[in-house]
């Protein structure tokens, strides 16, 4: 017997927004602990073939970025589901790392995409505390316990140690991007893709950092038809 009813396609849609980092009672942040339940729910729908995830994040903690990325990959593998990522205002640094969990990445033409690098920033207060007459006392067990102390002169060995950690984290980030994007990337060295530079969505498309330009509703309807059910 022929069916006169076309099977409806359902695509769960999750939104991940904010600076990436551990959240607390008085601190907002996007971390795996806060996103685990909504991600698990999205992948738990029966008979789905795709999950859509919109990302709006400038980055943050490399650890939480990687944890969220890995959890999305894990769920996709377990449920045999494809992941479609949609970058909104920004998917940069850790936000882009999470985007790499997608089988496809889309962005708005004006989205900010990339910033594949690592940054650390601080201030030096040595002259300030001297000027206002504050005497600082520090007691440690372990000669490197006060590494990068902002109240004393910067030490060359401290900076060197920090740089080595940054390079290690950067290498891990690059590996994730290369694994995700592969041959889609257009001449990474020539185009400074791994230098921390960032681009608009339109420029990112030309570099192979995203697969297309468009928003979730538009792209999902183009892919699955006007009657696709997007479960937000």
Regions found by a protein language model. Name each.
Residues 1-108, 119-232:
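N-terminal organellar transit peptides
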């Amino acid at each position: 017997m022929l069916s006169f009813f076309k099977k409806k396609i359902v695509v769960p849609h999750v939104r991940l927004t904010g600076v990436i980092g551990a959240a607390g009672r008085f601190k907002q942040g996007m971390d795996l602990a806060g996103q685990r339940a909504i991600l698990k729910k999205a992948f738990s729908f029966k008979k789905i073939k795709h999950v859509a995830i919109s990302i709006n994040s400038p980055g943050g903690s490399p650890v939480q970025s990687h944890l969220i990325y890995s959890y999305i990959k894990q769920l996709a593998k377990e449920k045999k589901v494809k992941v479609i990522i949609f970058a909104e205002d920004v998917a940069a640094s850790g936000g882009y790392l999470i985007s790499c969990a997608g089988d496809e990445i889309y962005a708005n033409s004006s989205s900010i995409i990339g910033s594949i690098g690592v940054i650390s920033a601080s201030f030096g207060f040595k002259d300030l505390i001297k000027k206002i007459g504050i005497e600082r006392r520090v007691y440690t067990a372990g000669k490197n316990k006060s590494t990068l102390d902002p109240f004393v002169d910067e030490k060359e060995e401290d900076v060197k140690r920090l740089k080595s950690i940054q390079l290690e984290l950067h290498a891990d980030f690059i590996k994730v991007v290369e694994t995700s994007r592969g041959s889609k990337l257009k001449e990474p060295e020539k185009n400074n893709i791994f230098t921390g530079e960032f681009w608009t969505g339109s420029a990112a498309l030309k570099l192979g950092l995203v697969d297309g330009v468009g928003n979730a509703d538009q792209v999902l309807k183009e892919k699955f038809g006007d009657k696709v059910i997007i479960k937000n």
